[in-house]
């Protein structure tokens, strides 16, 4: 046998060993049986795939006990991760870019939403004098939590229309009944939130929508392109040290995305907690119907959409603007690709 033939045989054997190793790893249980997951505003339709995964028992089927802690907004969920009280987060993709800019590598492993569904609205009493985001100057704007992606949307539009990002004040109002109450009591001048909150406030005539990312066209109008929304992210160290646990989480979420894609709004609403409807089941079901197109069908990330998010953040966030961010390192499709092979 020639040296070349020997080398080829060794290479083939090595590939076989790798393949066997990967197959064995896939058959091995996750490194962790219990995972602590943080989320900011779980009743929001932004996070519907997470709740579907939980309610249908897909985490359990993947060999995981997932303990979900719900915080008032995404920034609080991120703080839980950084502080060590959470292992992973279901949150906005934006945070992966911001944390990399701070030399804290956070990586998104599955995309749940292909556009955000955020809506900027002014209260009815302010609607007559509103012409553009430049009129947000001096307003008190209710967001899910200070530092959350709902605040980023408002600041992006403000900077885009000649304002500074601190030309308005921001107050956290959550993403459920507390947000509705803040508007009803007139505690704020404008709001950035998601359905079902926005849909309910619209039905009551309390707000005027002025920017809407509940559709792809609206997202392009606001952000200039497709924009990643809800994702599952974790520290790079967790992903590298717990690859089977990460894969199990992704498998469960991708399974839920496939389930959602094949169901009607009525079927999806039936598995959600009744209190998420904010007292109006019919309107809630309609909100789900409107939101269904924004959920990913396969969990994959688009480089183009990720670059759009980076461009938006760089325009108003000095930390991002002053850092060298490798956008390709903020997400991975590796786990989603393996999940796609599931039956």
Where are these regions (language model features)?
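Conserved C-terminal helix/tail region of periplasmic/extracytoplasmic solute-binding proteins
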Residues: 310-343
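Short, solvent-exposed loop/beta-turn-alpha elements that line the ligand-binding surface or hinge
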Residues: 61, 128, 215-225, 293-301
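Secondary-structure end/capping motifs
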Residues: 239-320
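Short, glycine-/small- and polar/acidic-enriched structural segments
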Residues: 26-174, 185-195, 206, 210-211
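Short, low-complexity disordered leader/linker segments with a strong preference
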Residues: 1-32, 341-343
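Extracytoplasmic/secreted envelope proteins and their assembly/folding machinery
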Residues: 47, 78, 93-96, 133, ...
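Pocket-lining segment of extracytoplasmic ligand-binding domains
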Residues: 178-274
């Amino acid at each position: 046998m020639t040296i070349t033939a020997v080398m080829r045989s060794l290479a083939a054997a090595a590939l076989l060993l790798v393949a066997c190793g990967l197959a064995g790893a896939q058959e091995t249980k996750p490194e962790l049986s219990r995972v602590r997951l943080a989320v900011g505003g779980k009743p929001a339709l932004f996070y519907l795939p997470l709740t579907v995964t939980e309610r249908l028992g897909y985490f359990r089927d993947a060999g995981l006990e997932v303990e979900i802690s719900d915080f008032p907004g995404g920034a609080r969920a991120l703080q839980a991760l950084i502080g060590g009280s959470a292992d992973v987060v279901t949150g906005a993709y934006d945070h992966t870019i911001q944390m990399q800019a701070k030399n804290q590598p956070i990586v998104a492993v599955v995309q749940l939403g292909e556009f955000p569904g955020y809506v900027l609205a002014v209260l009815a009493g302010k609607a007559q004098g509103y012409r553009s985001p430049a009129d947000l100057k001096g307003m008190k704007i209710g967001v899910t939590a200070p530092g959350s992606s709902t605040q980023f949307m408002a600041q992006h539009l403000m900077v885009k229309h000649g304002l500074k990002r601190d030309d308005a004040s921001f107050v956290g109002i959550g993403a459920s009944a507390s947000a509705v109450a803040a508007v009803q009591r007139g505690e704020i001048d404008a709001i950035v939130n998601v359905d079902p909150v926005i849909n309910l406030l619209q039905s009551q005539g309390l707000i005027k929508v002025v920017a809407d990312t509940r559709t792809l066209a609206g997202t392009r109008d606001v952000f200039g392109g497709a924009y990643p929304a809800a994702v599952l992210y974790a520290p790079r160290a967790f992903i590298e040290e717990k690859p089977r646990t990460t894969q199990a989480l992704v498998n469960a979420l991708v399974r839920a995305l496939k389930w959602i894609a094949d169901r009607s709004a009525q079927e999806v609403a039936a598995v959600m907690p009744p209190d998420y409807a904010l007292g109006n089941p019919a309107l809630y079901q309609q909100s789900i119907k409107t939101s269904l197109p924004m959920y990913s069908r396969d969990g994959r990330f688009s480089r183009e959409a990720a670059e759009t998010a980076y461009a938006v953040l760089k325009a108003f966030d000095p930390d991002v603007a002053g850092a060298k961010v490798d956008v390709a390192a903020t997400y991975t499709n590796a786990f989603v690709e393996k999940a796609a092979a599931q039956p």
